[in-house]
């Protein structure tokens, strides 16, 4: 029996939850999120790696599987239909999840037992009127903050409910920001469109070093949206949060750099505006850590329509080069306007953009007479900032408004 347990960890690991318990009970943490819309109430939670092992008796995270617990209460009389693709467009089916659990022992026929065990823990798709259904959807692993939709349809009705659920394991940079302490109430002010254009044109041209003595990359983006809409818009577009710089993230970065592999949450260096490092940073990894898009945002004291106004910088890493100051550094694409426009397209295709326009910024620098950033990389630009009005609801690309700041009165 001991030998069997050593060979069959999938079945012999201590499982504190039966399949029925898994369906009915959320993961053992205090990170549940609840949202009510119309006649449905949805509760979600994401199990950490350790909690997943406790619930399922297996290290699912090592197989890139992250269980998301969902409970949907249908408070109406008509049946509703849950669409799991909103949680993850590439989610794993229950049988696929069970198959991955069995890959380590391909010669033993564990199909029937494991399939039933995992399948019985799954969230159903139909929620009858006046009933409640719960269970797990098996998604790809996201760390830091997991962002997803719960999409439910019924007769002539549709519910789209965004969720942001924290997942332990990373030290995310913006978790340390005290948003209420950034500015005294007396400095915060709501402005008109005309005043917004003037105020943005008077903002600093560029990021600086810590002492504020040397200019770096141009501040070429402005984002208007509350904290949740800002996070959700970028994460829905496939951008990841970044870790703080500490031993764990440095080691992960080093391993990724040496192997050329992807590290989605790699720290970004501190750049400064308003005398402080970025409030939040996002990145979109490509084929390796050497190739990524990253952006930094600083909240300003301005509000437009009651929403926070952020100023920021976006650039595209296209390689790594050696420097005297930092030994190695990322090399940016000098066409910073192309990267700026990529962000417009990216948010538009993610249905996160309500409108956009342009204001003056750093001023033009042409191909033959470029400026330089803090690490000596050249860049050229038309000198403008794009102003992005985020949408809290999915916005069709054909309905995005072009804001004429030149005609703002």
Predicted features and spans:
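A cross-kingdom signal targeting lumenal/periplasmic-facing segments of multi-pass membrane
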Residues: 66, 73, 247-407
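Surface-exposed edge beta-strand/loop patches
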Residues: 15-19, 90, 121-187
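Terminal, regulation- and interaction-focused segments at domain boundaries
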Residues: 203-233
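Short, hydrophobic/aromatic beta-strand segments
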Residues: 78-86, 148-150, 231-236
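Bacterial N-terminal signal peptides
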Residues: 1-11
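The feature marks short-to-medium sequence segments in extracytoplasmic or secretory-pathway proteins
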Residues: 75-128, 133
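Short, solvent-exposed beta-strand/turn "edge" segments of beta-rich domains on protein surfaces
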Residues: 52-69, 75-79, 126-128, 211-212
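Low-complexity, acidic Ser/Thr/Pro/Gly-rich terminal tails and inter-domain linkers that flank the onset
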Residues: 21-62, 200-201
């Amino acid at each position: 029996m001991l030998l069997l347990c050593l060979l069959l960890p999938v079945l012999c690991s201590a499982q504190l939850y039966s399949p029925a318990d898994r369906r009915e009970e959320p993961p053992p943490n205090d990170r549940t999120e609840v949202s009510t819309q119309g006649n449905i109430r949805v509760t979600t939670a994401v199990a950490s790696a350790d909690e997943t092992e406790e619930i399922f008796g297996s290290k699912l995270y090592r197989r890139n599987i992250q269980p998301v617990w969902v409970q949907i209460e249908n408070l109406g009389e008509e049946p509703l239909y849950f669409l799991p693709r909103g949680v993850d467009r590439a989610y794993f089916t229950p049988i696929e999840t069970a198959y991955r659990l069995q890959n380590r022992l391909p010669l033993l026929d564990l199909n029937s037992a494991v399939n039933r065990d995992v399948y019985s823990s799954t969230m159903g798709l139909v929620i009858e009127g006046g009933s409640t259904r719960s269970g797990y959807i098996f998604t790809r692993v996201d760390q830091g903050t997991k962002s997803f939709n719960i999409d439910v349809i019924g007769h002539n009705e549709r519910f789209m409910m965004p969720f942001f659920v924290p997942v332990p394991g990373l030290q995310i940079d913006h978790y340390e920001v005290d948003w209420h302490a950034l500015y005294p109430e007396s400095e915060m002010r709501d402005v008109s469109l005309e005043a917004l254009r003037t105020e943005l044109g008077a903002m600093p041209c560029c990021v600086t070093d810590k002492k504020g003595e040397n200019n770096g990359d141009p501040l070429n983006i402005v984002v208007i949206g509350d904290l949740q809409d800002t996070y959700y818009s970028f994460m829905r577009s496939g951008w990841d949060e970044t870790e703080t710089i500490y031993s764990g993230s440095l080691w992960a970065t080093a391993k990724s750099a040496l192997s050329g592999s992807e590290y989605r949450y790699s720290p970004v260096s501190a750049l400064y505006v308003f005398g402080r490092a970025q409030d939040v940073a996002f990145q979109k990894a490509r084929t390796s850590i050497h190739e990524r898009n990253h952006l930094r945002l600083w909240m300003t004291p301005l509000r437009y329509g009651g929403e926070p106004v952020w100023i920021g910088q976006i650039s595209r890493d296209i390689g790594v080069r050696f420097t005297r100051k930092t030994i190695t550094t990322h090399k940016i694409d000098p066409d910073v306007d192309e990267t700026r426009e990529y962000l417009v397209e990216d948010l538009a295709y993610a249905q996160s953009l309500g409108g956009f326009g342009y204001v003056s910024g750093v001023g033009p620098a042409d191909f033959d007479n470029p400026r330089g950033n803090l690490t000596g990389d050249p860049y050229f630009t038309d000198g403008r900032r794009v102003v992005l009005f985020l949408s809290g609801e999915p916005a069709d690309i054909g309905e995005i408004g072009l804001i004429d700041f030149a005609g703002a009165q």
